[in-house]
């Protein structure tokens, strides 16, 4: 993207303890980073990944924060940063042969999205 963003008017939202691996969430975030709010919503709607649901919720929350707290127009917003960090793993046990048990880790992640006003340069 050729447009730059302003750091003065930035709104952000976080989704914490989201079920799903970090790598699968980052795969989607890499595709919407730097895009406008409308383009990102359209892309998320038609992507075949399970992680698009929580990402859409966090994106809508960030835009609502920009609209209500900063008075910004949603049509002029661009995703300035989007990241996913590792959360705690839930440990479960699966019974195996001869009385053994294998550990299964159900991964979680933290999603952070920041939106800013798009400036034409």
UniProtKB/Swiss-Prot annotation:
Keyword annotations from UniProtKB, A to Z: Ribonucleoprotein, Ribosomal protein, RNA-binding, rRNA-binding
The keyword RNA-binding is annotated on this UniProt entry:
yes
A GO CC annotation recorded here is: cytosolic large ribosomal subunit
From the record, what ranges are coiled-coil? none
* GO-annotated molecular function: rRNA binding; structural constituent of ribosome
Among its keywords, does the record have rRNA-binding?
Answer: yes
Q: InterPro entries attached here? A: Ribosomal_uL22, Ribosomal_uL22_bac/chlpt-type, Ribosomal_uL22_bac/org-type, Ribosomal_uL22_CS, Ribosomal_uL22_sf
* GO-annotated biological processes: translation
- Physiological role: This protein binds specifically to 23S rRNA; its binding is stimulated by other ribosomal proteins, e.g. L4, L17, and L20. It is important during the early stages of 50S assembly. It makes multiple contacts with different domains of the 23S rRNA in the assembled 50S subunit and ribosome. The globular domain of the protein is located near the polypeptide exit tunnel on the outside of the subunit, while an extended beta-hairpin is found that lines the wall of the exit tunnel in the center of the 70S ribosome.
The subunit structure is: Part of the 50S ribosomal subunit.
Q: What protein family does this chain belong to? A: Belongs to the universal ribosomal protein uL22 family.
Name recorded for this polypeptide: Large ribosomal subunit protein uL22
The organism's lineage?
Answer: Bacteria, Bacillati, Cyanobacteriota, Cyanophyceae, Synechococcales
Gene designation per UniProt: rplV
């Amino acid at each position: 993207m050729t447009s730059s963003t302003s750091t003065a008017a930035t709104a952000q939202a976080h989704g914490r303890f989201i079920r799903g691996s970090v790598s699968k969430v980052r795969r989607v975030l890499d595709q919407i980073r730097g895009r406008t709010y409308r383009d990102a919503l359209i892309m998320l709607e038609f992507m075949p990944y399970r992680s698009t649901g929580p990402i859409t919720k966090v994106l809508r929350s960030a835009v609502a924060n920009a609209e209500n707290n900063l008075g910004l127009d949603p049509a002029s917003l661009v995703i300035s940063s989007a990241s996913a960090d590792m959360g705690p793993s839930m440990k479960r046990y699966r019974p195996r042969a001869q009385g053994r048990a294998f550990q299964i880790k159900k991964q979680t992640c933290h999603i952070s999205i920041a939106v800013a006003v798009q400036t034409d340069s």
